[in-house]
């Protein structure tokens, strides 16, 4: 399977230099199964399907979207199972839960260092590449062991600006 994601890449040294490119990740079902086992998670059919869906999605799905996408394929899948499984994956560090505001929670299977931009008009969430050493830009962080950082940006996407 191939995973195609659209990224808006920003070079933070030159704010005017912006490019859009498509990146392709090759992830096999066997690799995903091994990731679950490495995290100490038994790879049941439902867990593997949910993990595969979130890791393949570039749309930052909600639990409801994951459920709707997989319920026919898996038959006995419940929304509660999806919520519990996603929480299990988040707790294991396999995916991230995005809480850009108090009313919206979605999930991200892209574990590379990136920020999230949410358009205030259309609601679309876009991954923005960033340098891995962006933590060094934070003052007063010496002596801390940072295990996670999430950067959320809000504004208008290029499509909404054109309208």
Please tell me what each predicted stretch does.
Residues 82-92:
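Basic amphipathic alpha-helical segments that dock to polyanions
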Residues 1-27:
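Short, intrinsically disordered or compositionally biased N-terminal tails of bacterial proteins
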Residues 27-40:
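Short, Lys/Arg-enriched N-terminal segment that forms or immediately precedes the first helix
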Residues 65-71, 82:
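A short acidic, leucine-rich amphipathic alpha-helix
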Residues 62, 78-79:
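Short coil turns linking two alpha-helices in DNA-binding domains
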Residues 43-45, 56-62:
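Short capping segments at the starts of secondary-structure elements
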